[in-house]
Amino acid sequence: MSLDKIMNEAISPWMKGDGPDSDIVLSSRIRLARNFKKYQFSTMQNEEEAKQIQELFKKEFINKTVEPFGEFELLKMNELTPLQRRVLVEKHLISPNLAGTEYGACLLSENEHISVMLNEEDHIRIQCLFSGLQLSEALQSANQIDNWIEKEVEYAFDESLGYITSCPTNVGTGLRASVMIHLPGLVLTKRISRIIQVIQKLGLVVRGIYGEGSEALGNIFQVSNQMTLGKSEEDIIADLKSVIQQIIQQEKMARELIVQNSSIELEDKVYRSYGILANSRLIQSAEAANCLSDLRLGIDLGYIKGISRNILTELMVLTQPGILQQYAGGPLGPEERDYRRATLIRERLRIEKN
């Protein structure tokens, strides 16, 4: 695996999967926060300690193979251009926080299912991504990597509290489980606000597709647990999965209601968005996201034939500003990005239809 390959292949293997409930659930993510006993927290550490953690991973873990994830490569943030960092964020391989650090790094698996972020808010954050609703499978893979790393380092762990983390909400298991979910039916029926309120009362968090502070573009929401102390990993996963399954049922009911009461209006909305995507010469990010959401809904409901439902996930990533500029070989102005975005979408749809 090379940096060029990571940068030039915008679609990660997990995006091409077709996991359970993938008509509504786009992806499942597990993140484990861990700190090393011998070092201060990342928020307090000095440059020397941050470099020592990088060197430890360079020595012990790069070019090592762990099945089924392949080899691992270490990407240091201060050796990447701002554009390369942005691409990694847009591919969901690193967090925006890590991209902004000077001594952060990412240990990335060949198949891009696993990303271990170094020197972010915690010493390491192990991330595992799967398509569809596969929280248990993602947790199993994350634990496999956790055990692999723990053979070489001693974690900060307290018998009564669990794993010690820089943020109190992560103390305990250090587990953050999240699901990316497409909810156009609940948005169109204006039920989404009530659903979000219920989710939050259950102790869960609802965010946009790039986490804290990001927008829910294209009717895509990220739902995750908040507290980890006093709960087992299995309980956290079971609680989140139960809520997600209820949201899935609510979304299906909302879609059925729209089809029953406003079928021709919905079909018109889908085909108008399809027409914009198939013919536009300039299109901005927000409009593209909304039209792609309509197209995906049309595919799921059977209005649109011959186009893969994965097109929403793929094009939501492919048309992000960083990836567009990476493909262009350098910086682009807003209008140039809008032109390239429209061109890429038209070509992708043409390939699908052929």
Swiss-Prot record:
Disulfide bonds: none
Domain Phosphagen kinase C-terminal: 24-254
Pfam families with a match to the protein in the record: ATP-gua_Ptrans
Annotated EC: 2.7.14.1
Amino-acid positions noted as binding ATP in the UniProt annotation, renumbered to this chain: 27-31, 92, 125, 176-180, 207-212
UniProt function note: Catalyzes the specific phosphorylation of arginine residues in a large number of proteins. Is part of the bacterial stress response system. Protein arginine phosphorylation has a physiologically important role and is involved in the regulation of many critical cellular processes, such as protein homeostasis, motility, competence, and stringent and stress responses, by regulating gene expression and protein activity.
A Gene Ontology term for the protein's cellular component: extracellular space
Domain of life: Bacteria
Means of activity regulation: Appears to be allosterically activated by the binding of pArg-containing polypeptides to the pArg-binding pocket localized in the C-terminal domain of McsB.
Keywords: Allosteric enzyme, ATP-binding, Kinase, Nucleotide-binding, Transferase
Family, as annotated: Belongs to the ATP:guanido phosphotransferase family.
GO biological process, one term: phosphocreatine biosynthetic process
Stated name of the protein: Protein-arginine kinase
Catalytic activity: L-arginyl-[protein] + ATP = N(omega)-phospho-L-arginyl-[protein] + ADP + H(+)
InterPro entries found in the cross-reference section: Arg_Kinase (IPR023660), ATP-guanido_PTrfase (IPR000749), ATP-guanido_PTrfase_AS (IPR022415), ATP-guanido_PTrfase_cat (IPR022414), Gln_synth/guanido_kin_cat_dom (IPR014746)
Residue ranges annotated as motif RDXXRA motif of the pArg binding pocket involved in allosteric regulation: 337-342
Any GO MF annotation of the entry: creatine kinase activity
